[in-house]
């Protein structure tokens, strides 16, 4: 009996680095579940990062949502069955997207929280853009799921944001920035955190379980694996 065809994954991309890591994770890990050279059908659409950031910097989340919905419409027409976005920051607009979306979404924070719970973590350090660290997307969902959380101090939040937008999204990865993130995460381990959320989809390209003072929750790869599992259901 032929195996049912996997669901078609639609990726609403934002930055090239995060989207590429998500796509590669799905394609790299699918063969272990599906067989050699196999992966679900995947379509991706992205407006340029600059278009998104014009709205983000103005706190115009409806504008961000409109871009995401435009991508969603294109992916629905391409045959996608559900959607993901490997970008934590633009998830702040998802509440405006979901009610008008032609397709269902996997939420990156829901998937991170599920993995954190399965590993028995209780208090999570949140790293990412300033918007992610200072906003409510992770904070509300983590509290609702029963977690405590902590974020870096104001100076560290500003520096991490600079690293992300001046370096990581442009494919620049330096030892200086890696060392800085290690120091920040190390300080948060002393605040009782038992794992760190890599809450920017480019941070896993700089920090991983080997280099991090705390166990990592790699939001990019977690979302990719959740999408792969959903496609195979």
Where are these regions (language model features)?
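Non-catalytic structural scaffold of enzyme domains
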Residues: 1-233
